[in-house]
Design a protein with these regions (language model features):
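Ala/Thr-enriched low-complexity intrinsically disordered regions
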Residues: 2-4, 27
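Short, positively charged and aromatic/hydrophobic N-terminal segments
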Residues: 8-25
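Long, solvent-exposed, polar/charged low-complexity segments
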Residues: 28-47, 64-72, 158, 167-170, ...
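Active-site acidic/histidine clusters and adjacent loop/turn architecture
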Residues: 39-92
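Hydrophobic/aromatic-rich structural module bridging two neighboring secondary-structure elements via a short loop
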Residues: 78-122
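Short, structured patches in soluble enzyme cores that scaffold and shape functional sites
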Residues: 117, 142, 211-213
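Compact, glycine/acidic-enriched structural inserts
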Residues: 133-186
Length: 249
């Protein structure tokens, strides 16, 4: 499909074409086959079953990539850095790395895509889509930051606490992302005052946010629109992190 952003028409008309195209594409996507495959591979997580049902996996993977493509196009309307991001650079292999795990089942039971202008291995904040029966979510943030980068982000939060609070405590953001971070220090990180009024924002071991969703979210015909709206509310958080990381680098 032609990328509407490269069609030489006026900006407003171009955006309208993208929206109409995405709505049509979303209607034609077979999202249920993604859930069918994931449920079946979860119940039959072995190579014999997988090899016998490779066609089902390929269909599920193709539909997930179609979904990601539509989401990328919609995100591009409010985040220009995402324009030109390719689906192949956002997805992950279905095969688990079992070398250091007691769980030797060979296949993942979810499909995920990380939409990031700098690549899925970047420290920068991106947009994550996760489909797993009973554990679907949308998420974003910066994961596993190197210690010096993490310290720089904490310093930016400390120095610009009013701006940061204005982002993460905004009702439009908080309705989808009520908590920042997943793992936390027990006390203030080294170099920051323990009595800082908003020390909870400095205790984060990673600056991430999660929006859990029922399976029905992705099965709904408007899931691309709703996903884009949720990520749009996340963008100021992403901008804060990415500006800080850019400045540090």
């Amino acid at each position: 499909r032609a990328d509407a952003f490269f069609v030489p028409v006026c900006s407003m008309l171009g955006k309208l074409c993208v929206i109409l195209s995405d709505n049509k594409e979303n209607t034609n996507m077979n999202i249920p086959v993604i859930f069918q495959f994931l449920k079946e591979v979860s119940a039959n997580n072995n190579r014999e079953w997988f090899n016998a049902h490779k066609d089902l996996y390929e269909e599920a993977r193709r539909e997930f990539e179609n979904l990601l493509s539509a989401i990328i196009t919609r995100i591009s309307l409010f985040d220009e850095s995402i324009r030109g991001v390719q689906v192949k650079d956002c997805t992950y292999r279905i095969y688990r790395d079992t070398r250091f795990s007691q769980d030797k089942t060979p296949y993942k039971t979810h499909l995920g895509g990380y939409i990031n202008a700098r690549g899925k291995k970047s420290d920068h904040c991106g947009y994550y889509v996760h489909i797993e029966p009973g554990n679907c979510l949308l998420a974003g943030g910066s994961y596993c930051l190197p210690p010096k980068t993490l310290k720089a982000v904490r310093q930016a939060v400390y120095d610009n606490i009013d701006e940061f609070r204005g982002i993460v405590e905004n009702p439009d953001f908080k309705q989808y992302f009520p908590v920042i971070g997943e793992d936390f220090l027990k006390t203030a990180p080294k170099g920051f005052p323990k009595d800082f009024e908003y020390v909870q924002y400095l205790k984060c071991k990673e600056y991430t946010c999660y929006c859990n969703q029922p399976d029905s979210f992705f099965l709904a015909p408007d899931c691309v629109d709703r996903t884009a709206e949720i990520f749009k509310q996340m963008k100021p958080f992403a901008d804060f992190l990415n500006y800080t990381i850019d400045d540090f680098e």
